[in-house]
C-alpha cells in the first residue's frame, strides 16, 4: 500500500502544479504564442535550448514546429540547439560547456528570431550565455523556468517573456513545461490555421 500511495503522490503533486500554473500563466503563455507567430510570419525562426530534460523539451518543441502538432500544416522554422552532437562536443571541447548554445545562437540567430530558453532552475550557465548571445543578435527571448526564475528572471528585458512555473520540485516543473510547450504549439496553430 505504501508504494501505491507514493505513486499516487506523484499524480497529486503534478495536478497541483498544473492547477497553480493554470491560475497564473495563461496570459503569459498567450503572449509568448503571439510573439512566436509574429516571428514566424516575419520569416524568423525559433531556436530552442536547454539541458537534460529541458534539452529533450527543446527538441520536442522543435519537432512539433517543423513536423506538426495536431493539425496538418507546412513546417514552421524551429531548431533545437541541443541536438547537434558534433557542434555540442566541438564547442564544449574547444571552448567550454557554458558556450555550447551561445556559439550556435551567434552563428544561426538573426534580428527578429526568437530564443526559447529552458531551465528548470533558471540558473543554467549555458542557457544564460545563450540569452546574452540572443540579446546581442537583437533576438527576443521566451524563457521557461521554475522555482523563482533564478538568474534568468533577472536577464529578461521588456521585450522578453518569462514563463516561470512557481514550484520547487524539478519533475513537476518539467511536467508543467511540456504542458506549456503543447499549449504554445496549439496556440500557434490556432492563430495560423484557425479552427476549434
From Swiss-Prot:
One of its GO terms (molecular function) is carbohydrate derivative binding. Its EC number is 5.3.1.28. It catalyses: 2 D-sedoheptulose 7-phosphate = D-glycero-alpha-D-manno-heptose 7-phosphate + D-glycero-beta-D-manno-heptose 7-phosphate. It is found in: Cytoplasm. PROSITE patterns: SIS. CDD domains: SIS_GmhA. Residues 36-196 form the SIS domain. One of its GO terms (biological process) is D-glycero-D-manno-heptose 7-phosphate biosynthetic process. Pathway: Carbohydrate biosynthesis; D-glycero-D-manno-heptose 7-phosphate biosynthesis; D-glycero-alpha-D-manno-heptose 7-phosphate and D-glycero-beta-D-manno-heptose 7-phosphate from sedoheptulose 7-phosphate: step 1/1. Substrate binds at residues 51-53, 64, 93-94, 119-121, 124, 174. One of its GO terms (cellular component) is cytoplasm. Binds 1 zinc ion per subunit. Pfam families: SIS_2 (PF13580). Its main location: cytoplasm. Its cofactor is Zn(2+). Zn(2+) binds at residues 60, 64, 174, 182. InterPro entries: GmhA/DiaA, Phosphoheptose_Isoase, SIS_dom, SIS_dom_sf, SIS_GmhA/DiaA_subfam. Keywords: Carbohydrate metabolism, Cytoplasm, Isomerase, Metal-binding, Zinc. Belongs to the SIS family. GmhA subfamily. Catalyzes the isomerization of sedoheptulose 7-phosphate in D-glycero-D-manno-heptose 7-phosphate. NCBIfam families: PRK13936.1 (NF010546). Homotetramer. PANTHER family: DNAA INITIATOR-ASSOCIATING PROTEIN DIAA (PTHR30390:SF6), SEDOHEPTULOSE 7-PHOSPHATE ISOMERASE / DNAA INITIATOR-ASSOCIATING FACTOR FOR REPLICATION INITIATION (PTHR30390). The reaction produces a racemic mixture of D-glycero-alpha-D-manno-heptose 7-phosphate and D-glycero-beta-D-manno-heptose 7-phosphate. This is Phosphoheptose isomerase. It comes from Laribacter hongkongensis (strain HLHK9). The lineage of its organism: Bacteria, Pseudomonadati, Pseudomonadota, Betaproteobacteria, Neisseriales.
Amino acid at each position: 500500500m505504501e508504494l501505491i500511495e507514493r505513486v499516487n503522490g506523484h499524480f497529486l503533486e503534478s495536478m497541483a502544479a498544473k492547477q497553480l500554473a493554470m491560475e497564473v500563466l495563461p496570459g503569459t503563455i498567450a503572449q509568448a504564442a503571439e510573439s512566436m507567430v509574429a516571428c514566424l510570419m516575419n520569416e524568423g525562426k525559433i531556436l530552442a535550448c536547454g539541458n537534460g530534460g529541458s534539452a529533450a523539451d527543446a527538441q520536442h518543441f522543435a519537432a512539433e514546429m517543423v513536423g506538426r502538432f495536431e493539425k496538418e500544416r507546412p513546417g514552421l522554422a524551429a531548431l533545437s540547439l541541443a541536438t547537434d552532437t558534433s557542434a555540442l562536443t566541438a564547442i564544449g571541447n574547444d571552448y567550454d560547456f557554458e558556450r555550447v548554445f551561445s556559439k550556435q545562437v551567434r552563428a544561426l540567430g538573426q534580428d527578429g528570431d526568437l530564443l526559447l530558453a529552458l531551465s528548470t532552475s533558471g540558473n543554467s550557465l549555458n542557457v544564460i550565455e545563450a540569452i546574452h548571445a540572443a540579446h546581442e543578435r537583437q533576438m527576443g527571448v521566451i524563457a521557461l523556468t521554475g522555482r523563482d526564475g533564478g538568474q534568468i528572471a533577472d536577464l529578461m528585458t521588456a521585450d522578453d517573456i518569462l514563463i516561470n512555473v512557481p514550484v520547487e520540485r524539478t519533475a513537476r516543473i518539467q511536467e508543467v513545461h511540456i504542458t506549456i510547450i503543447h499549449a504554445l504549439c496549439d496556440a500557434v496553430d490556432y492563430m495560423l490555421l484557425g479552427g476549434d
